[in-house]
């Protein structure tokens, strides 16, 4: 890895969201990883928790962020923290895609993005196994899911 990562460099992943792994765990001795992600209009990332902190930098568009029981909107240029082990969700509030950078500390969960991008659609067992390996727990029964969908038309 070079000291400069170009805008078109990184590992492109398939899946529902366009994800590019820009910096991997092995590049930083496990300190951090960096991904770039495009969130489609109206898309909601289900409330979940994980064992690392994630800093989100909004490059374009605007995202909604739920952290714990607080909701905030983050426009281009803003930063948001999704702390480890705290329930959180994100969604695109606009009619155009939102582009974000996520800094994962410590590193490791970039592998979850890589693993889940390779799963066949509907492979719930593979998805659950990857979540378990990487300490990620989705909460589809969270009352926040319904609230966010209704409030923001997601």
Language-model features, listed with the residues they occupy:
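Short acidic-glycine-tyrosine-enriched beta hairpin
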Residues: 55, 62, 69-87
């Amino acid at each position: 890895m070079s000291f400069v990562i170009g805008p078109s460099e990184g590992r492109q992943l398939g899946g529902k969201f366009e994800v590019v792994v820009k910096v991997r765990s092995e590049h930083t001795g496990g300190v951090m990883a960096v991904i770039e992600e495009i969130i489609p209009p109206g898309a909601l990332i289900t409330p979940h928790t994980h064992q690392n902190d994630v800093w989100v930098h909004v490059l374009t568009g605007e995202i909604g962020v739920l952290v714990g029981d607080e909701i905030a909107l983050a426009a281009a240029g803003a930063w948001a923290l999704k702390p480890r082990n705290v329930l959180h969700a994100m969604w695109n509030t606009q009619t155009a895609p939102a582009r974000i950078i996520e800094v994962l500390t410590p590193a490791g969960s970039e592998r979850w993005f890589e693993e889940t991008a390779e799963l066949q659609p509907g492979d719930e067992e593979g998805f659950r196994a990857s979540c378990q390996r990487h300490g990620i727990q989705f909460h589809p029964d969270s009352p926040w899911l319904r609230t966010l969908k209704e409030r923001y038309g997601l």
